[in-house]
């Protein structure tokens, strides 16, 4: 049976086109995906991301568990509220999931994991936690909203009780704090997102969600569907689990080597494989592509390089660049002339560094 968020009726009343996304009925757009994309880049949009899974970890051994569980190092997390992006790996070095972990107290950390991997993640985390003094708690009582765009932070802050505004305005990137709404209900606000824009992601009680959603709409924040969320994240150079990486792909093969910390004395799951890959290199890599000719890059299209064949992972039309962009996994080595097979035509594409767009600005290498 398909799942629905607390905002399902609200989305339908706003005219949203609803689709099945990882077993959840979610809005893909509210009329024009391209207009929604531009509104986030230029102003502020609100996303219902309540399909995401929130997992709280309690106990005296949470940090030792996470030092084992995650490829990035939670030893970086020393200030309450600070967050870290990491991959969770299997023993073969493949990515079980990518996630954000928050340090709240020494005996209390929080995960935000993907909707599509919920059952797998919970099973894996519980299995690993069984050797530690840790209690794993899924927070199905919480909903999640993302407010993103250059005006997003101001719009959210204006809705908070005055006693909390200053602290939220000063909140640094990849940091969170809990404040009270006007109705005195707890809001967990983090300065994170999946769009390449500034903004907040907000966890709140299910019963408070419609009230906050409507209050933000009244300020001029527009509802944004998952279609624009995908084009925004791709422009921002952000991976999508299940499309850009999975359990057969290591972080080094998914342009996520920057999330791996091979710090001394920490034997995280998959480390042996990653150490070998770092020493010897990997046989394949993820690159960014931009197509100057008309057309769209699509998942699965064949990519031809001097080193051999690869394929498009994520591809889309970029509303900001007015060109097709994509990620591709291709053989290792410096790709020179690269072509994509589109309807039996080999179309030349350029290899460019990503992100393609960051905070509304086209990156300098795009139009070289």
UniProtKB/Swiss-Prot annotation:
It is an enzyme of class 2 (transferase). SUPFAM superfamilies: Aminomethyltransferase beta-barrel domain, Folate-binding domain. Its EC number is 2.1.2.10. It comes from the Bacteria. InterPro entries: GCS_T, GCS_T_bac, GCST_C, GCV_T_N, GcvT/YgfZ/DmdA, GcvT/YgfZ_C, TrmE/GcvT_dom1. The keyword Cytoplasm does not apply. It catalyses: N(6)-[(R)-S(8)-aminomethyldihydrolipoyl]-L-lysyl-[protein] + (6S)-5,6,7,8-tetrahydrofolate = N(6)-[(R)-dihydrolipoyl]-L-lysyl-[protein] + (6R)-5,10-methylene-5,6,7,8-tetrahydrofolate + NH4(+). GO terms for biological process: glycine decarboxylation via glycine cleavage system. Belongs to the GcvT family. The glycine cleavage system is composed of four proteins: P, T, L and H. This is Aminomethyltransferase.
